[in-house]
Amino acid sequence: MTTIRRFSCNDLLRFTSVNLDHLTETFNMSFYMTYLARWPDYFHVAEGPGNRVMGYIMGKVEGQGESWHGHVTAVTVSPEYRRQQLAKKLMNLLEDISDKIDKAYFVDLFVRASNTPAIKMYEKLGYIIYRRVLRYYSGEEDGLDMRKALSRDVEKKSVIPLKRPITPDELEYD
């Protein structure tokens, strides 16, 4: 049985094996602690039998006005637990919090342009490629900014794709 619950400080010492995947972005401990302190509603872990960490999602809410949105900073599932709809459950949880609690207009995320399996999964979940960010990742790899409109964005303005790629310095952070 899988349990999804809020991430805790103790989990920081238990989730290293999930981060070993080469497609998973990893961060330093203070980065995780900042998210845990500032956006605890957006940080969840999935546990299996024996309290084994199966995956996690980490995000935040940010922006102003019609740019108010939920953001998926990281979502990852350990290879042995993939293809069990776990990432979908974690994504749905973050989307629900963004939509129902924080009344966001959309949820966004960044994904490596080469990570075809993740892109396909996000598209199945209703995300669209909003824009390409040139050289977003280390190694000069492009990133794709993917978005999904939430119920507050009745006209779906937040998911009208941009016509041209942008550079990282053109990104706006709130």
From Swiss-Prot:
Origin superkingdom: Eukaryota
Gene3D superfamilies cross-referenced by the UniProt entry: 3.40.630.30
Catalysed conversion reaction: N-terminal L-methionyl-L-asparaginyl-[protein] + acetyl-CoA = N-terminal N(alpha)-acetyl-L-methionyl-L-asparaginyl-[protein] + CoA + H(+); N-terminal L-methionyl-L-glutaminyl-[protein] + acetyl-CoA = N-terminal N(alpha)-acetyl-L-methionyl-L-glutaminyl-[protein] + CoA + H(+); N-terminal L-methionyl-L-aspartyl-[protein] + acetyl-CoA = N-terminal N(alpha)-acetyl-L-methionyl-L-aspartyl-[protein] + CoA + H(+); N-terminal L-methionyl-L-glutamyl-[protein] + acetyl-CoA = N-terminal N(alpha)-acetyl-L-methionyl-L-glutamyl-[protein] + CoA + H(+)
Domain called N-acetyltransferase: residue spans: 2-151
Keyword annotations of the record: Acyltransferase, Transferase
EC number: 2.3.1.254
PROSITE patterns, sorted: GNAT
Matches recorded under Pfam families: Acetyltransf_1
Class of this enzyme: transferase
Molecular-function GO term, any one: protein N-terminal-methionine acetyltransferase activity
InterPro entries reported in the protein's UniProt record: Acyl_CoA_acyltransferase (IPR016181), GNAT_dom (IPR000182), NatB_acetyltransferase_subunit (IPR051646)
Annotated transmembrane regions: none
KO phenotype (gene knockout): Reticulated leaves, early flowering and aborted or unfertilized ovules in siliques.
Function: Catalytic subunit of the NatB N-alpha-acetyltransferase complex. Involved in plant immunity through the regulation of SNC1 stability.
Homology family: Belongs to the acetyltransferase family. ARD1 subfamily.
PANTHER family assigned to the protein according to its UniProt record, in alphabetical order: N-ALPHA-ACETYLTRANSFERASE 20
Name by which UniProt lists this protein: N-terminal acetyltransferase B complex catalytic subunit NAA20
Species name: Arabidopsis thaliana (Mouse-ear cress)
Gene: NAA20
